[in-house]
Swiss-Prot record:
The keyword Cell inner membrane does not apply. Residues 1-24, 94-105, 181-184 are cytoplasmic. This is Casparian strip membrane protein 1. GO terms for cellular component: plasma membrane. The lineage of its organism: Eukaryota, Viridiplantae, Streptophyta, Embryophyta, Tracheophyta.
Length: 184
């Protein structure tokens, strides 16, 4: 009887290694997806500007992302998260090779959570400004600027997509690392 129990345990080990390796490969793929999302968001927001044409050369109205500190924070936050994700790729590759690495997975869970908080703060702050740009605020007497600066508003709205997508991917990465640790 003891032999069959040992036999069952040894046949389970290759299966666990295969699942752990699969989780590590998925982790690497998700990191690449998050890199693309944060990089695209930072570039889209960082290159956004629009100048309204007027009849005179002396009066021009211009909208740039750098006019609003919140949008600048959005670009910086996405850039930091993108840099972190690029720097975490080697660790993710190590997990494919050595799926038993425990400390590095714990480190990634912690740092992924910090980066999730950073990208959430940046995206949420930018989303509030984008909402005000589209709708304005009657009580504060803030007019909606998107009727005049339509391409500016389209770009800043579109840049939020990659950032919110990266938030979802970071949540999945944290869950994936937690599952991989729990399987130990």
């Amino acid at each position: 009887m003891k032999e069959s129990g040992e036999h069952g345990e040894t046949s389970k080990a290759p299966l666990n290694r295969g699942v752990s390796k699969g989780l590590s490969v998925l982790d690497l793929i998700l990191r690449f997806i998050a890199i693309i999302g944060t990089l695209a968001s930072a570039i889209a927001m960082g290159t956004t500007n629009e100048t309204l044409p007027f009849f005179t050369q002396f009066i021009r109205f211009k909208a740039q992302y750098s006019d609003l500190p919140t949008l600048t924070f959005f670009v910086v936050a996405n850039s930091i998260v993108c840099a972190y994700l690029i720097l975490s790729l080697p660790l993710s590759i190590v997990h494919i090779i050595r799926s038993r690495a425990k400390f590095s997975r714990l480190l990634l869970i912690f740092l992924d959570a910090v980066m999730l908080a950073l990208v959430t703060a940046g995206a949420s702050a930018a989303a509030a400004i984008v909402y005000l740009a589209h709708k304005g605020n009657v009580r504060a007497n803030w007019l909606a600027i998107c009727q005049q600066f339509d391409s500016f508003c389209e770009r800043i709205s579109g840049s939020l997509i990659g950032s919110f997508g990266a938030m979802v991917v970071l949540i999945l990465l944290i869950l994936l690392s937690a599952i991989a640790l729990a399987r130990r």
